[in-house]
Each structure stands twice: as structure tokens, then as C-alpha cells.
Swiss-Prot record:
Name this polypeptide is given: Cytidine deaminase
One Pfam family linked to the record: dCMP_cyt_deam_1
Enzyme Commission designation: 3.5.4.5
Cellular component, GO annotation: cytosol
Superkingdom to which the source organism belongs: Bacteria
Bridged cysteine pairs (disulfide): none
Binding site for substrate: 42-44
Residues that hold Zn(2+) according to the record: 53, 86, 89
Species per Swiss-Prot/TrEMBL record: Bacillus subtilis (strain 168)
Cofactor(s) this protein cannot do without: Zn(2+)
Cofactor note as given: Binds 1 zinc ion per subunit.
Gene Ontology MF terms in the entry: cytidine deaminase activity; identical protein binding; zinc ion binding
Catalytic activity from the UniProt record: cytidine + H2O + H(+) = uridine + NH4(+); 2'-deoxycytidine + H2O + H(+) = 2'-deoxyuridine + NH4(+)
Catalytic site positions: 55
Lineage: Bacteria, Bacillati, Bacillota, Bacilli, Bacillales
Length: 136
């Protein structure tokens, strides 16, 4: 699957978004190394802190099905420029994807920004930070 096909899947996922409060629909499509695609959309809740973003929905679906090796993630929304993942999504992406996974950000006008996970969140907090030997 190429980049444009994955973007099309992200746009399809966006159509499934449950965003009755913000009306801000986001879709994501995650391509595994073996060619499977997991789509995710944002799902809102009246208690905003309970909302889940499209990127995390796609990643959690994949991991819950046993897929943990990814090659590309596409995210699409109706924004002036390519959509920018929130900080929580950036952290989850950096935790569940290797640094070289390609992240494709786009909008409904077809503007595209492509980067690696490492470029998306440089200096990410990781499991290595939790296991660092510290003197108290």
C-alpha cells in the first residue's frame, strides 16, 4: 500500500468519527509491516478528558489484535495545514512505533507533511527513562 492509499483509508476513518461536541473529525490509518491496515477515528465524550483521538484508536486496535510492527501512520483532518497530533498521541506513537516509522499528516485540501516518529517527538520520554539507575 502506498502513501496515497493509506491517506484514503485515514479519510474513510474520519467519516466514522464521533465528534458531536467539537465537530472536529479526525481519521487515522495504520499500516503494519505485513500489510494490514487498522483505521481509527476520534471518539468524543461529554466529559472531554474521556475522549480518544484517532491515532490512539488505530494503534490500540492494532496492538489489541497482536500487531506491533508498523511501517506507516496517516492522519487526516479538516485543518488549515496538515493536521498536528496532540501531545498525548505523540507520546503513544513514540511508545508503540519504532523511531523510523513514517508519519503522514494531511488535511482535506491534500496538503501533506511527512516525517518519522523520531522527528514527530524528538527526545521522547521512553521506557529507558523509567529504568535509569538513580541515586536517591
Amino acid at each position: 500500500m502506498n502513501r496515497q492509499e493509506l491517506i484514503t483509508e485515514a479519510l474513510k476513518a474520519r467519516d466514522m468519527a464521533y465528534a458531536p461536541y467539537s465537530k472536529f473529525q479526525v481519521g487515522a490509518a495504520l499500516l503494519t509491516k505485513d500489510g494490514k491496515v487498522y483505521r481509527g477515528c476520534n471518539i468524543e465524550n461529554a466529559a472531554y478528558s474521556m475522549c480518544n483521538c484517532a491515532e490512539r484508536t488505530a494503534l490500540f486496535k492494532a496492538v489489541s489484535e497482536g500487531d506491533t510492527e508498523f511501517q506507516m501512520l496517516a492522519v487526516a483532518a479538516d485543518t488549515p495545514g496538515p493536521v498536528s497530533p496532540c501531545g498525548a498521541c505523540r507520546q503513544v506513537i513514540s511508545e508503540l512505533c519504532t523511531k523510523d516509522v513514517i508519519v503522514v499528516l494531511t488535511n482535506l485540501q491534500g496538503q501533506i507533511k511527512e516525517m518519522t516518529v523520531e522527528e514527530l517527538l524528538p527526545g521522547a520520554f521512553s521506557s529507558e527513562d523509567l529504568h535509569d539507575e538513580r541515586k536517591l
